[in-house]
């Protein structure tokens, strides 16, 4: 039995240590805007999105957060990958990230032998980290796909 409809990513929600700093960073780097506050028991979330909501990132704080730095070896989120159409798009993003002082991740969850954009059999990837050390990837399929 096949799934009824293809699914696609609706949003990503991340717990952060400094909500205001993370909101500013994500808005600057991704060109998105604060859209909505979402109060919840023990904290608050802020939804950030572009105008057509094709990219939506929710950032949350929790009163009970241990305020430890993120590490992908713990159970839960490993990293977040965002899709781009071409390697040329990755190159433009590389320049954009550099303009904001964002550098390629010094460590990734797998070896990256090419810097800053790694070309692997299944595509090309640019890996960087947010202020809480969460690994973010921009991914483009192999050319010709």
Spans of features found by a protein language model:
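Short, well-ordered turn and helix-capping elements at secondary-structure junctions
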Residues: 36, 61-64, 108, 142
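A cross-family glycoside hydrolase active-site/sugar-binding cleft signature
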Residues: 58-60, 83, 139
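Vicinal oxygen chelate
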Residues: 2-5, 8-17, 47-51, 69-145
């Amino acid at each position: 039995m096949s799934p009824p409809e293809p699914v696609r990513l609706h949003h990503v929600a991340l717990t952060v240590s400094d909500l205001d700093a993370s909101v500013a960073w994500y808005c600057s780097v991704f060109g998105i805007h604060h859209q909505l506050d979402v109060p919840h028991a023990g904290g608050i979330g802020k939804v950030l999105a572009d105008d057509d909501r094709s990219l939506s990132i929710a950032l949350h704080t929790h009163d009970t957060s241990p305020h430890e730095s993120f590490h992908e070896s713990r159970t839960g989120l490993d990293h977040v990958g965002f899709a781009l159409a071409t390697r040329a798009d990755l190159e433009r993003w590389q320049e954009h990230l550099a303009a904001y002082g964002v550098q390629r991740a010094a460590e990734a969850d797998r070896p990256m032998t090419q810097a800053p954009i790694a070309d692997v059999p299944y595509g090309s990837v640019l890996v960087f980290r947010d202020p809480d050390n969460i690994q973010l990837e921009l991914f483009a399929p192999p050319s010709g796909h």
